[in-house]
């Protein structure tokens, strides 16, 4: 036996993940396990370790979809054609073989054809008929489908995967119409730092667990020792754990036999439902999964009745990962309420003026108020209230559910699918799809005698072009007013909000740039980058004060956007945070301008934003007593989204910009 994966029994620690994988093998109806963890925490090794713990299956002989002989209603088209009543075979005569349960892996760059299936070119060329071959979804039927970096899977493939998890996959393309079973256990691994799972997919997976970092020195040493032994002699190392693996496999087979007999009381079911309601879990799927998991755990333990420990496992693996409401700890619930706060101290009586005021010190109301020319404000902390976090998570889920971050192209990127060549455009030939399109017509074309002795006859109507997909995030250009007037409009809030937004951009794989304007000119403080720490560090050092070169800032933002568009930037979003009181012309050396001339210059530059294909968001921070309403005119000229935040806080600004940027995404 060729061994290329560690046995699950040899993996040190990660007991929760190993238990979840085992329970998925006990009850495939749980649909799968999602394993979250940072790089190097053993997610892939754990997932692949399940391969050797899957009990063998009986299947129809010669079926690539591993059709179940006991379920004729679910057979694929090929098996229905071979083993129907017309074939003359009775149920007892249908050829059945025993095979290892399949374990299929979906590479991140898989195409739709590889996932769903397509025309079998070899058989079609030989027979001159449209024959099909199943994709990875069909090959994984009654086994495991493993996807690494599940959160980064192409949106089109995710939608196909979502449909297939219903148990049946239908293929309608290239003149063929087939249906085949797709009952598999989905094991997905991902790094949460690179984004979470799409909501509709995560909801279909019963168990969500984490592979944590092992900090125990002895365990880490043991991990190194075992890995070295496995690298030197994989087969010998596997034999060391063969007995333990066999015991686990026999135990899983026994648990599958016991599972139909396991019962759960109504009170226990109500407890699980109550936990879902308490924790704000939406929908009913968590209730169904938690009951199934409690039964599976009881069967794994060899029992026919659910006990409290089974309920606890169900809550931990199914309900807690889906919760949207934080519950206080039991200890906190048992504590008496805190005592009322002490009354405020009485106000101090007005103190009489100090009779011994030095003669050279003038009274305060007669002193001239001296203001520094520059101010430094720390970034304000951003308290994220529950409602704010809920909205933030909703926006993130919506963003992940669409086609954000992807650009389709005929020239470069990852080959995703084939299509008819667009007229008038150069494209690359998709040889695989072209041959599949031509295959069914080979016999007919040879018999026509028009093509001589050619073995493979391809015509223009068969040609298919490659469509590529590449990552293409947005460039979010923060243009922040650091003039003197902003000092009194909560510059600290702006800094706090931008810090949050920089983190948001990092999660979405966007680039950020930071332009501040004060004094006589605008300055690109941070050119387009994905380095959040660099942007934060430089922004925290920005002083506030001086004039407001608003025109120069808009011009500089447009220039940065024009220079960045293309490559891995597919969209430019300019976020302007200002009170709209620009007072420095585009070219200060050209001489002073009156207010009307300044405003017209700013509006003319604002009109260039949509002309360059950019989007814009204007946050008006002007005090309602001093506002001129000019920021709204800027937004109108740029066809921008406009928000007025006179009582700006870091939290409100951050959420406003996040919502606005999400709405502007293409």
Curated annotation (Swiss-Prot):
GO molecular function: ATP binding; magnesium chelatase activity
Lineage: Bacteria, Bacillati, Bacillota, Clostridia, Eubacteriales
Database matches in SUPFAM superfamilies: Formin homology 2 domain (FH2 domain) (SSF101447), P-loop containing nucleoside triphosphate hydrolases (SSF52540), vWA-like (SSF53300)
Chain segments carrying region Disordered: 327-367
GO biological process assignments: bacteriochlorophyll biosynthetic process; photosynthesis
Pathway note: Porphyrin-containing compound metabolism; bacteriochlorophyll biosynthesis
Domain VWFA residue range list: 475-661
PROSITE patterns found in the cross-reference section: VWFA
The protein, known as: Magnesium-chelatase 67 kDa subunit
Compositional bias annotation for Pro residues: 335-347
Family annotation (Pfam families): AAA_lid_2, Mg_chelatase, VWA_2
Catalyses which reaction(s): protoporphyrin IX + Mg(2+) + ATP + H2O = Mg-protoporphyrin IX + ADP + phosphate + 3 H(+)
Keyword ATP-binding: yes
Record keywords, A-Z: ATP-binding, Bacteriochlorophyll biosynthesis, Chlorophyll biosynthesis, Ligase, Nucleotide-binding, Photosynthesis
Biological role: Involved in bacteriochlorophyll biosynthesis; introduces a magnesium ion into protoporphyrin IX to yield Mg-protoporphyrin IX.
Family, per entry: Belongs to the Mg-chelatase subunits D/I family.
Species of origin: Heliobacterium mobile (Heliobacillus mobilis)
Enzyme Commission no: 6.6.1.1
Annotated binding of ATP, by residue: 37-44
Highest taxon above the source species: Bacteria
């Amino acid at each position: 036996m060729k061994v290329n994966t560690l046995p699950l029994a040899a993996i040190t620690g990660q007991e929760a993940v190993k238990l979840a994988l085992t329970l998925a093998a006990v009850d495939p109806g749980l649909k799968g396990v999602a394993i979250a963890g940072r790089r190097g925490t053993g997610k892939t090794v754990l997932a692949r370790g399940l391969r050797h713990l899957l009990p063998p299956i009986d299947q129809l002989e010669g079926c690539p979809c591993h059709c179940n002989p006991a379920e004729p209603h679910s057979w694929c088209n090929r098996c229905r054609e071979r083993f129907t009543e017309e074939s003359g075979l009775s149920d007892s005569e249908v050829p059945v073989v025993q095979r290892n349960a399949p374990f299929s892996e979906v590479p991140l760059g898989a195409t739709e054809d590889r996932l769903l299936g397509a025309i079998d070119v070899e058989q079609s060329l030989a027979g001159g008929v449209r024959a099909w071959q199943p994709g990875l979804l069909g090959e994984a039927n009654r086994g495991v489908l493993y996807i690494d970096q599940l959160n980064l899977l192409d949106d089109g493939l995710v939608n196909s995967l979502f449909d297939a998890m219903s148990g049946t996959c239908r293929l309608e393309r290239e003149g063929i119409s087939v249906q085949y079973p797709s009952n598999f256990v989905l094991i997905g691994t991902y790094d949460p730092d690179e984004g979470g799972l799409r909501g509709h997919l995560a909801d279909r997976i019963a168990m969500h667990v984490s592979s944590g970092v092992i900090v125990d020195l002895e365990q880490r040493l043991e991990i190194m020792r075992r890995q070295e032994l496995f690298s030197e002699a994989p087969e010998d190392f596997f034999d060391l754990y063969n007995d333990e693996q066999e015991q686990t496999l026999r135990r899983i087979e026994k648990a599958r036999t016991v599972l139909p007999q396991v019962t759960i009381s109504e009170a226990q079911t109500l407890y699980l439902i109550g936990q879902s309601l308490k924790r704000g879990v939406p929908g009913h799927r968590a209730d169904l999964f938690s009951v199934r998991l409690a039964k599976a755990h009881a069967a794994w333990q060899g029992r026919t009745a659910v006990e409290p420990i089974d309920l606890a496992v169900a809550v931990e693996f199914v309900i807690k990962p889906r919760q949207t409401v934080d519950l206080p700890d039991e200890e906190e619930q048992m504590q008496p309420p805190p005592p009322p706060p002490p009354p405020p101290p009485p106000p101090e009586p007005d103190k009489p003026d100090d009779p011994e005021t030095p003669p050279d010190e003038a009274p305060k109301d007669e002193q001239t108020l001296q203001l520094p020319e520059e101010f430094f404000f720390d970034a304000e902390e951003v308290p994220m209230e529950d409602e704010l976090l809920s909205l933030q998570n909703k926006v993130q889920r919506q963003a992940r559910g669409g086609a954000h971050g992807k650009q389709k192209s005929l020239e470069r990127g990852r080959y995703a699918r084939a299509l008819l060549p667009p007229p008038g455009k150069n494209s690359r030939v998709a040889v695989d799809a072209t041959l599949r399109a031509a295959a069914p017509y080979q016999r007919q074309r040879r018999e026509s005698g028009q093509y001589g002795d050619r073995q493979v006859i391809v015509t223009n109507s068969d040609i298919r072009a490659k469509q590529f997909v590449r990552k293409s995030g947005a460039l979010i250009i923060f243009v922040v007013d650091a003039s003197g007037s902003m000092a009194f409009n909560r510059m600290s809030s702006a800094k706090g909000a931008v810090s949050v937004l920089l983190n948001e951009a990092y999660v979405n794989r966007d680039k950020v740039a930071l332009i501040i304007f004060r004094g006589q000119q605008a300055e690109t403080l941070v050119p387009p980058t994905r380095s959040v720490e660099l942007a934060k560090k430089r922004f925290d050092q920005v002083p506030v004060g001086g004039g407001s070169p608003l025109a120069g800032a808009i011009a500089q933002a447009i220039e940065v956007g024009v220079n960045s568009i293309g490559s891995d930037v597919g969209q430019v979003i300019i976020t302007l945070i200002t009170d709209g009181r620009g007072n420095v012309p585009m070219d200060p050396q050209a001489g002073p301008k009156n207010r009307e001339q300044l405003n017209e210059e700013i509006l003319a530059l604002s009109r260039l934003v949509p002309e360059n294909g950019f989007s814009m968001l204007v946050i008006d921070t002007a005090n309602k007593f001093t506002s001129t309403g000019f920021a709204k005119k800027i937004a109108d000229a740029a066809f921008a989204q406009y928000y007025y935040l006179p009582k700006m806080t870091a939290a409100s600004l951050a959420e406003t910009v996040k919502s606005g940027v999400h709405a502007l995404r293409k």
